[in-house]
Structure formats: C-alpha cells, structure tokens
C-alpha cells in the first residue's frame, strides 16, 4: 500500500499527536492486533505500547481478550468516542489540504513553499487517511522546482521511496467521506 510507504518517508516529521491518530485510524480500519498495527503504521513496538496506553486512557480504544485456537489473543477496537475523534481530526486535515490546494492553485510559489514547510508534520497523516491527491501533491513540488526527496532531505530512513512512481496511483480513492469511516 503506497500511502504506508509515504508515511515511512515522512515518519520523522510526524508529531506524537499525528501518530496517535494514525494508530487510531489503523485500528478503525480493521488492523486490531499489536504486531499488525506496528507493521501497518511503521511505529516501533516500544513507542506503539505508549500510544495504545494513551488511546485507552483517553477512552478512544478498548482492549479485549479473545480466546482463539492458539490460546488468548488481544484485540483492539475503537470506541464511539475514538470514532468521533477520527472524524473531527480528518475534517481538520481536509481543511489543511484544501488550504494547501488553494495556495497551489493561486500560483504563488513563495507562499506554497511557506505553507508546505508549516504543514510538513501533517503531511504523513493526510497521506495515511487518503486526503492528499498525490498527483496534485507532486505537481506542487514541480511548481516549487524541487523534488520530494529535496523537500524531505536529511531523512535517513525511507528515502528510497521518495521518488517512487508507484505512489501516484494512491490518488484520492473516493474519500469524500473522509476515507476510513
């Protein structure tokens, strides 16, 4: 899944709050086991433990023990409060993307560079939830005259995906409803 690869590129720019939302979104999208959440979000187990604890403390997820063929397994589920949080945060991110798109469409290169710089930490979350139109996003870099890898220069991990042509097919897959709802 290309948006996951994109998150790896931008992972170091993600704020703690963005990681919380991405974990919540992954659980909401059916990734309910610890190891799978860690893989899907590219968040190390130690850090993921803390995030899950925080989400549980805030009442956004519930931890359930299920009996399976191989013994007990822990399953995580999003609560109604957690679902409301996802909807609200996705709405905010859609607003940020809309602003970014409007600046791009205005043709103001300097303003676009400034807004991109200011919103850098939100970009992975926008990508994870399918808010970013990848074609337009790449055209923004063209307008600024820089490559994505230059914009995120210095990111030691995941840069091999920076110019992945496959990313452009992630598109805006019918996300008028916010994607994961």
Label each region the model flagged.
Residues 1-126, 142-181:
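N-terminal leader-region detector that preferentially activates on the first domain or presequence
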